[in-house]
Amino acid sequence: MDSAAAAFALDPPAPGPGPPPAPGDCAQARKNFSVSHLLDLEEVAAAGRRAAGPVSGPAEARVGAAREPSGGSSGTEAAPQDGDCPSPGRGTKRKKKQRRNRTTFNSSQLQALERVFERTHYPDAFVREELARRVNLSEARVQVWFQNRRAKFRRNERAMLATRSASLLKSYGQEAAIEQPVAPRPTTMSPDYLSWPASSPYSSVPPYSPGGSSPATPGVNMANSIASLRLKAKEFSLHHSQVPTVN
């Protein structure tokens, strides 16, 4: 115990963890990492805490800190250092590297993924994790595959609808052209016909004028001739009665 106290007096205690990074820097760095990378950082932090082990008292903690070399760092300090926000240049390089990586799926993996896609286009996290274990892929790869597969499905659906609507419009136009009768062309009227004045249906019978200037109809002529004959017969009889007879 005396040797431990002497060692603690000679060696200064190890410096504590530095101040936490600014919230703005952390928010900018989180955009450069995927969900799987953040999960890996949490696993590293948990492993560092398990490696440090439980501490029974403050005295033993001070002794352990005194025994460590000055250039090293304890297991408890490894987690904050790993969790610090990296520089923007490093995050950008890692993001570009992740974009270049392309996963090649074999036939069995594609068959399993397509079978699940037929059941649901939006699998939840549990389904994705279960499927990732079955096909020996990461959950992030499975999620990206489903996103690309949904985009492809929407493109194929839009193309199919466009083709179907175009064929329906084409067939409808052909049927309408066959069933619709040919409209007659409008005939142009001659200038002579247009020069005739408009008249009523009874305009063929000329109106009666007392002056007798208009021609009479056959019935009227017959009646006039009969009346004139009677008048002449009457005049003849009167004239015959007035002439004296010579004995």
From Swiss-Prot:
Q: Where is this region: Disordered?
A: 1-31, 49-107
Identify the SUPFAM superfamilies for this entry: Homeodomain-like
Query: Low complexity compositional bias: what residue ranges?
Result: 1-11, 49-59
DNA-binding stretch(es), residue numbering of this chain: 98-157
Q: Does the keyword Transmembrane helix apply?
A: no
* Basic residues composition-biased segments: 91-102
Motif OAR is found at 224-237
Where does this one sit in the cell? Nucleus
| Listed Pro residues bias regions | 12-23
Which terms are listed as keywords in the entry?
Answer: Developmental protein, DNA-binding, Homeobox, Nucleus
GO cellular component entries = nucleus
The GO molecular function terms of this record are:
DNA-binding transcription activator activity, RNA polymerase II-specific; HMG box domain binding; RNA polymerase II general transcription initiation factor activity; RNA polymerase II transcription regulatory region sequence-specific DNA binding
Similarity-based family: Belongs to the paired homeobox family.
Name of the molecule in the record: Paired mesoderm homeobox protein 2
Name its species.
Mus musculus (Mouse)
